[in-house]
């Protein structure tokens, strides 16, 4: 990949006080947002099918420990110890989606997840809001494409599992173009700016 050293160049330029913008595609497969959406979808499917197995618990803990929830380790431990998975905001929000899941498209399910878990506003707590929003937009478009070829929510879950487990790359352009900066890009990216 010709963009391997771009981050180093950016650090050097910014060290000497020169603002820079990187023009490169980022692989989103290892981003938290992809995992969170995948785990929320898994929770919804498991609740719909009333399967409270190890996979359900794994997905629950993933969401509970994320910036989308306010659970600390003691809360999670008590939920496990007392088997109180159904008495918390994560389960309640997912169950609300389950109630109307059969009449929703994959895009509508994602929209409900983003809305009920206040995903966009929670980005503020972790920063990099624009890039995280681009990931959600990419997923929204992808879910629409999967809707158009007849994929159900279980198929979407399998699709996301496949991407993550096979370590495939999904690259999207996450360029931050703020102001008057030095632009670092490959020759191929520069051709589009002529």
What label would you give each PLM region?
Residues 1-58, 99, 108, 113, ...:
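Conserved motor-region signature of P-loop NTPase helicases/translocases
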């Amino acid at each position: 990949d010709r963009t391997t050293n771009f981050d180093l160049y950016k650090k050097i330029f910014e060290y000497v006080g020169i603002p820079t913008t990187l023009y490169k595609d980022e692989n989103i497969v290892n981003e938290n947002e992809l995992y969170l959406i995948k785990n929320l979808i898994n929770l919804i499917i498991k609740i719909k099918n009333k399967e409270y197995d190890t996979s359900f618990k794994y997905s629950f803990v993933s969401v509970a420990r994320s910036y989308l929830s306010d659970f600390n380790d003691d809360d999670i431990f008590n939920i496990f110890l007392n088997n109180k998975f159904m008495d918390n905001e994560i389960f309640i929000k997912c169950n609300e989606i389950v109630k109307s899941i059969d009449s929703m498209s994959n895009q509508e399910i994602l929209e409900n997840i983003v809305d009920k878990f206040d995903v966009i506003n929670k980005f503020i707590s972790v920063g990099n809001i624009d890039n995280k929003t681009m990931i959600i937009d990419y997923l929204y478009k992808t879910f629409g494409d999967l809707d158009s070829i007849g994929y159900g929510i279980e198929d979407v879950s399998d699709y996301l599992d496949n991407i993550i487990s096979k370590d495939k790359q999904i690259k999207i352009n996450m360029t931050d173009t703020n102001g008057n900066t030095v632009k670092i890009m490959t020759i191929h990216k520069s051709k589009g700016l002529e």
